[in-house]
Amino acid sequence: MSEVASVTDAQIEKFSLLYKERRKVQMMRFFGVTALTLISARLAFKGVASRKYIPTMFQLNHKPPPFSYKGEVVNALAYGTALSTGGFAMLGFGLCWIWDVSTLKELGNKLKELMGDGSEKDKLVSTNMDLDEDTQKVADALEAMLSTKK
């Protein structure tokens, strides 16, 4: 029971603050990428809408407006790259935010687990991870609390 008393509310609050800060960073990354994707989508839409040919009273309705082929290619490449990169970044950061993943190894393990890879060697198990002193105290205290309630 002395192990339970060794974990103070301040230590638990510290880990809670670290967790909240990590989740906030994940959220801000997702919303930042979302904002950039929406801005690039708006620019692409305006670029397409500005090229629409609307003839006036006595102009031909099938005459294409003059434009630069190089400029069109550069604009299309830039808009396409921005939209696809933004979409994939939103997918990646959104999954990391939803699954509470902080590292690429955690993300890889989560994806393997979802796809049915049953190998146990890559799973993150708390007994295999090196814990710092404060985390070890909290883990020991929680294990002691759970074992005394049986």
From Swiss-Prot:
Q: Which residues cross the membrane?
A: 28-45, 77-99
List cellular component terms (GO): membrane; mitochondrion
Q: Where in the cell is it found?
A: Membrane
Its domain of life? Eukaryota
Q: Which UniProt keywords apply?
A: Membrane, Transmembrane, Transmembrane helix
Which coarse location class describes where this protein primarily resides? membrane
Write down the InterPro entries for this protein, in alphabetical order: AIM11
Q: Is ATP-binding given among the entry's keywords?
A: no
Membrane topology of the entry: Multi-pass membrane protein
Q: Family per UniProt?
A: Belongs to the AIM11 family.
Q: What is this protein called?
A: Altered inheritance of mitochondria protein 11
Q: What species was this sequence derived from?
A: Kluyveromyces lactis (strain ATCC 8585 / CBS 2359 / DSM 70799 / NBRC 1267 / NRRL Y-1140 / WM37)
